[in-house]
Regions:
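Glycine- and other small-residue-rich loops at beta-strand/loop junctions that grip anionic moieties
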Residues: 20, 41-46, 69-71, 92, ...
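Helix-to-beta-strand junctions that scaffold the AdoMet/dcAdoMet cofactor pocket
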Residues: 60-62
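Adenosine-nucleotide cofactor-binding segment
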Residues: 1-55
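Short glycine-centered segments of the SAM/dcSAM-binding site in methyltransferase folds
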Residues: 42, 64-65, 88
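Residues in the short beta-alpha loop(s) of Rossmann-like NAD(P)-binding domains
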Residues: 1-4, 72, 95
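Rossmann-fold NAD(P)-binding glycine/threonine-rich loop
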Residues: 70-86, 98-105
């Protein structure tokens, strides 16, 4: 799900079958439409806002899973709606160190190319500009060089 063309292209390159640009109720309805009325088996929520979390839950089929990573920003999940959604919710900080050895191995053996997400390269002393570019959606991810 993205409204940004560069992210949409990258998602398709990584194997996405569809791009959904709608948000909120419209976004959840579009996911249901694409899945024959059922909803997604699994949803990753990586934004951390009220709207994005509720859209994730509402886009997931009964018995499906929502995984969230990162810090939630004042998200309140209505108990009754969540209970009757029959959705499993899992989350917490991303355990980077757990996966890092395997990921490094995949990178070194050229089985994955993480460079595709880096569309802006800056010197380390411009780290603030890198974060600003990502926040303003001028960059997907910023690669900082010493």
């Amino acid at each position: 799900m993205s409204r940004h063309e560069d992210r949409q292209k990258l998602a398709l390159e990584f194997g996405a079958t569809d791009n959904v640009t709608e948000r909120g109720e419209e976004g959840a309805a579009r996911i249901k439409e694409l899945t024959g009325g059922l909803g997604a088996h699994s949803v990753v929520e990586a934004v951390g806002t009220q709207e994005s979390m509720m859209q994730a839950i509402r886009s997931t089929r009964a018995g499906g899973h929502v995984g969230f990573v990162g810090v939630l920003h004042d998200v309140e999940i209505p108990g009754r709606e969540f209970f009757y959604s029959h959705v499993h919710l899992h989350g917490g900080p991303a355990p980077v160190r757990r996966f890092l050895p395997e990921l490094i191995d995949l990178i070194w053996n050229r089985k994955i190319d993480p460079g595709k997400v880096f569309d802006l390269t800056l010197p380390l002393e411009q780290v603030a500009e890198g974060y600003r570019a990502m926040d303003e959606r001028r960059a997907i991810k910023t690669l900082l060089r010493p």
